[in-house]
């Protein structure tokens, strides 16, 4: 099993409901370790840059609006198979389809306000981590 790092974000719908600690605990209880964390309020420009891969999708404007509507907590998580483990703990994008006990099943309000984001592959993890953190901010 490989120790790897992944990117995780607690979205505005969750931070506004003071769920940062509860969500982080779920991640840590699954064996993931937070090696970098900061609370940020994304500008529209930052949200557009971070979600540029979705630029041509019909929901892009709404996504940017939502992500810049309040604070987010961006994190780097580390652990064995961290990418897959984080995605398992998050649950399906649509909370109606998420497994019991997952972050989205427990905390998400809707498919749009689904509380968390996590990298889906090593390449995206590296890109997303670099978008928000310098190397000196990650301390394992």
Swiss-Prot record:
Q: How does it assemble?
A: Homotetramer.
* Cofactors required: Mg(2+)
Please list the reactions this protein catalyses.
a 2'-deoxyribonucleoside 5'-diphosphate + ATP = a 2'-deoxyribonucleoside 5'-triphosphate + ADP; a ribonucleoside 5'-diphosphate + ATP = a ribonucleoside 5'-triphosphate + ADP
State the protein's name: Nucleoside diphosphate kinase
Q: Which gene encodes it?
A: ndk
Q: Does the keyword Cell membrane apply?
A: no
Source organism per entry reads: Rhizobium meliloti (strain 1021)
Q: Could you say which EC number(s) this protein's record lists?
A: 2.7.4.6
> Residues that bind ATP, according to the entry?
11, 59, 87, 93, 104, 114
